[in-house]
Regions:
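Non-transmembrane, aqueous-exposed alpha-helical and coiled segments at domain scale
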Residues: 1-433
């Protein structure tokens, strides 16, 4: 079985928590896009883990984890992440972690260039809100064919690889020197860095596609893990305030390494309210007062897992979520962090937009989203801790009514509802996987 777990909104929906649960019955968990520019948070009996590159399945010893061809991989960051979780007793080795030889390397200059450009824009009051992890520059160089792939690390003594490295470095020194007045990098230092990475990661680098194909053909359960959400997709998101990769489920088999395989299920993950990290239109934050937003931010601990930045917050946005569901094609829906709303007497929900007093018929990522005004419907809250609820029937009637209202607005059934951060805190409402 091939299952993709994707974000419906701007990211930070709780995909890691859902994937961790699915990994209990999975054989393989594979990331298929992005880099270390976002974090998946998983809470186990060992505490809280924040994973930037490693798939959420790494916390399950019998699961093989994969970093797929569609990713850009900061190897220095990956090494640190591996060390950090190994210190906490999590096993990481070539038997349970495989890196695609086709994945793109995030080179040392990508973070440098990202930071320099963000600083330049900030001086003009036009900062993009980049994570400064070099993701856009790594993807840009991938499509310009001016970077290395992981498989190249296995052939550093070959003339063709060394010639490419010379060509890449010459071009990059011209860019960084001409645009940002940086000192040139030396070829010898760069080659030494590559050799160091090869020494550490060579046992992990392989033809991931062949491994995944064999697993799929033998009936293994493969979970494909997305990063960020539909609103950040490079093609279908709110451009230019997007990531630099395809976050949609349709890309999952391709980015993982098995483009000929068809998904059996798409799990779309939604948070019980709206959050966003980074710049760009986000109507939900204007629906209520800043005091209300701050109360929600504190209740939900809404600070970026990768950056630590306070997340922009607001009520659940049905308009944006309907669009995200269409983009992802989800047949299963997980709603996370319902417990965060437990302290509210009334719970607002965005059910529509207006622009210049006229109702907006649908969500258009290329329209004037920064000027739309949210239309809010208010539902009664529940003054009860729901973290101990083990079944749908145990939830307060107001909590059930809230979920059912969202279902009606979205036109989709919600099968999974999380009632706390811990693994066991969830209830099932419908037929799950």
């Amino acid at each position: 079985m091939l299952t993709a777990v994707t974000g419906i909104n701007w990211g930070d929906e709780g995909k890691g928590r859902v994937i961790d649960l699915l990994a209990e019955h999975a054989d393989v968990v594979a990331r298929y896009q992005g880099g270390n520019n976002a974090g998946h948070t998983v809470v186990t009996e060992q505490g809280k883990f924040i994973l930037n590159l490693l798939p959420s399945g790494i916390l399950h010893p019998d699961v093989v984890c994969v970093l797929g061809a569609g990713m850009v991989i900061d190897l220095d960051h990956l090494a640190g992440e591996m060390d950090a979780i190994e210190e906490r007793g999590v096993k990481v080795g070539s038997e349970n972690l495989k890196l695609s030889d086709k994945a793109t390397i995030s080179m040392p200059w990508h973070k440098v260039q990202d930071g320099l450009e963000e600083d330049r824009l900030a001086q003009k009051g036009a900062a993009f809100g980049s994570t400064r992890r070099g993701i856009a520059y790594a993807y840009s160089d991938k499509y310009r064919k001016k970077t290395l792939r992981l498989g190249d690390l296995l052939h550093l003594d070959e003339k063709r690889v060394q010639d490419r490295l010379h060509m890449i470095l010459e071009s990059k020194n011209l860019e960084l020197g001409g645009c940002y007045h940086q000192e040139p990098m030396s070829y010898d230092a760069l080659l030494e860095w590559c050799r160091m990475q090869a020494g550490q990661f060579a046992p992990y680098i392989c033809d991931v596609g062949a491994f995944l194909q064999q697993a799929h053909d033998s009936g293994k359960h493969i979970v494909l893990e997305a990063q960020l959400g539909a609103m950040r997709d490079i093609d279908y998101g709110i451009f230019p305030f997007t990531s630099s990769s395809n976050t949609l489920a349709a890309y999952a088999p391709l980015g993982a390494g098995i483009p000929n395989c068809r998904l059996d299920h798409v799990v779309g993950v939604l948070k019980a309210y709206s959050t966003c990290v980074g710049a760009g239109p986000f109507a939900a934050e204007n629906a209520m007062s800043e005091d209300w937003n701050e109360q929600l931010r504190k209740a939900g601990g809404e600070y970026g897992a990768a950056t630590g930045r306070p997340r922009r917050v607001g009520p659940f946005d049905c308009v944006a979520s309907r669009y995200g569901l269409t983009c992802q094609g989800a047949d299963k829906i997980a709603l996370t962090k319902l417990d965060v709303l437990s302290s509210m007497k009334e719970i607002p929900v965005i059910t529509g937009y207006t622009l210049d007093g006229v109702q907006v018929p649908s969500f258009d990522p290329l329209s004037d989203l920064d000027r739309v005004k949210p239309v809010v419907t208010t539902l009664p809250g529940w003054n009860k801790d729901i973290s101990g609820c083990k079944s749908w029937d145990e939830l307060p009637k107001e909590a059930k009514a809230y979920v059912e209202f969202l279902e009606k607005q979205l036109g989709h059934e919600i099968q999974f509802v999380s009632t706390g951060a811990e693994r066991e805190k969830f209830v099932l409402k419908g037929e799950w996987l």
